[in-house]
C-alpha cells in the first residue's frame, strides 16, 4: 500500500493530465458537447483504481453522450497517462458525475431561506 503523500500526488497528477487530455488529446466530438470540469480525483491506496469526479455543463441529453464518450476513451486515456507519467501500470479509471456541484445552489437557497426566516422572527 502506498503512503498517503504518494496517493495525493498521483491524484493531483491525474487531475492535471486528464484535464489536459480532455481539452487537447481526445478528438471524440461527444466529449466536447458539454463543458467538462474535473472536480476531484480519488486514488485507492494500492494506486490501482482512480475515481474521477466531473461536473458537466450543457444540455441534459448531451451529458449522457459525454459519459458514453468518456467510457469509450478510457483505454486511450490510460495509455496516455502511463506514457506521460512514466508508470508501468496506470490505474483503472472510473468517471462519476459530481452530484455536489448540482446540489450546491439548492443548498444555498435553503440556507438563505432559513436566514430570512430567522431575521423575520427576530423583528
Swiss-Prot record:
Matching InterPro entries, A to Z? KH_dom-like_a/b, RbfA, RbfA_dom_sf, Ribosome-bd_factorA_CS
Q: Where in the cell is it found?
A: Cytoplasm
Q: Which domain of life is it from?
A: Bacteria
Enumerate the UniProt keywords alphabetically: Cytoplasm, Ribosome biogenesis
Query: What Pfam family is a match for this entry?
Result: RBFA
GO MF annotations in UniProt:
ribosomal small subunit binding
Question: Is the Cytoplasm keyword given for this protein?
Answer: yes
Spell out the SUPFAM superfamilies in the cross-references.
Ribosome-binding factor A, RbfA
Q: Which GO terms describe its cellular component?
A: cytosol
Task: Tell me the GO BP annotations in alphabetical order.
Answer: maturation of SSU-rRNA
Q: Which PROSITE patterns does the UniProt record give? A: RBFA
Look up keyword tRNA-binding and say if it applies: no
Q: How does it assemble?
A: Monomer. Binds 30S ribosomal subunits, but not 50S ribosomal subunits or 70S ribosomes.
Family label: Belongs to the RbfA family.
Q: HAMAP family, alphabetically?
A: RbfA
Give a short account of what the protein does: One of several proteins that assist in the late maturation steps of the functional core of the 30S ribosomal subunit. Associates with free 30S ribosomal subunits (but not with 30S subunits that are part of 70S ribosomes or polysomes). Required for efficient processing of 16S rRNA. May interact with the 5'-terminal helix region of 16S rRNA.
State the protein's name. Ribosome-binding factor A
Say which species the protein is native to.
Prochlorococcus marinus (strain NATL2A)
Amino acid at each position: 500500500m502506498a503512503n498517503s503523500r504518494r496517493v495525493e500526488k498521483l491524484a493531483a497528477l491525474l487531475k492535471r493530465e486528464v484535464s489536459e487530455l480532455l481539452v487537447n488529446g481526445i478528438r471524440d466530438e461527444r466529449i466536447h458537447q458539454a463543458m467538462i470540469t474535473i472536480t476531484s480525483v480519488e486514488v485507492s491506496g494500492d494506486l490501482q483504481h482512480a475515481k474521477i469526479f466531473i461536473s458537466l455543463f450543457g444540455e441534459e441529453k448531451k451529458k449522457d453522450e459525454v459519459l458514453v464518450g468518456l467510457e469509450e476513451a478510457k483505454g486511450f486515456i490510460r495509455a496516455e497517462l502511463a506514457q506521460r507519467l512514466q508508470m508501468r501500470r496506470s490505474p483503472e479509471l472510473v468517471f462519476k458525475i459530481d452530484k455536489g456541484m448540482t446540489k450546491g445552489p439548492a443548498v444555498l437557497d435553503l440556507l438563505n431561506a432559513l436566514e430570512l426566516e430567522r431575521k423575520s422572527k427576530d423583528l
